[in-house]
Amino acid sequence: MQTIIDAWFVQGMIKATSDAWLKGWDERNGGNLTLRLDEADIEPYAADFHAKPRYIALSQPMPILANQPFIVTGSGKFFRNVQLDPAANLGVVKVDSDGAGYHILWGLTEDAVPTSELPAHFLSHSERIKLTGGKDRVIMHCHATNLIALTYVLENHSDLFTRKLWEGSTECLVVFPDGVGILPWMVPGTDEIGQATAETMQKHSLVLWPFHGVFGSGPTLDETFGLIDTAEKSAEVLVKVLSMGGMKQTITREELIALGKRFNVQPLQSALDLYP
């Protein structure tokens, strides 16, 4: 008989967190991951739920998430340990009927709680639900090394970061034509950074937190992981290019436009117009 550990969403979270750890993106308890589920996903595993689910109020109501279940990583938990003890490091939560709080249905044992970045996740989920008609289901935050490094040497401007990442690897414009948003440095784990991230998610599926990390949104765990992985690969190329004296040639504006036409995507116009 299968248990909730065998469920696709638990196994998917195990793989995503393990892969992120192996990439070097999630040292210690760095990073967090949430996946929005359907009632049909969790209903077969009701026998595994806690007898008395704990209730935690949200700092602000989120009615668009009412009655929505999620699987989330825990606060203070190490990605490298998720595969060893999923129930201690992950949790299935369900937002209540008015969006004021949530019950912990499964996991997060020993009185653990969801990630401290849950406000940023839930606010971003709310915006991406509206923007994509519910298609986007994943929010991933990690400390991608080369993306962080670039925030120290490039002007922290969305159009510039977008253009440089597009130039760093040909596939980037195809994978994230909506570009990369970037915030000013802010204290993590607060409603303020959560709100700023969510507002930026209205325009971009990738949002950089300077000197800290990156947020990504997508329809599946694979798509969201791949989004960040693609941007991080380009950032790695750029870090190496900058260390070798900078670009001598690159993909031109006209070539980027041709690339967008070939793959039927609309590149962020302000990034295209930044320079020839």
Curated annotation (Swiss-Prot):
The keyword Transferase does not apply. SMART domains: Aldolase_II. Coiled coil: none annotated. It catalyses: L-rhamnulose 1-phosphate = (S)-lactaldehyde + dihydroxyacetone phosphate. It holds the Pfam family Aldolase_II. One of its GO terms (cellular component) is cytosol. Its EC number is 4.1.2.19. Gene3D superfamilies: Class II aldolase/adducin N-terminal domain (3.40.225.10). Pathway: Carbohydrate degradation; L-rhamnose degradation; glycerone phosphate from L-rhamnose: step 3/3. Its cofactor is Zn(2+). Keywords: Cytoplasm, Lyase, Metal-binding, Rhamnose metabolism, Zinc. The active site is at E117. It is found in: Cytoplasm. InterPro entries: Aldolase_class_II_sugar_metab (IPR050197), Aldolase_II/adducin_N (IPR001303), Aldolase_II/adducin_N_sf (IPR036409), Rhamnulose-1-P_Aldolase (IPR013447). Signal peptide: none annotated. The keyword Lyase applies. Catalyzes the reversible cleavage of L-rhamnulose-1-phosphate to dihydroxyacetone phosphate (DHAP) and L-lactaldehyde. Belongs to the aldolase class II family. RhaD subfamily. This is Rhamnulose-1-phosphate aldolase. It comes from Klebsiella pneumoniae (strain 342).
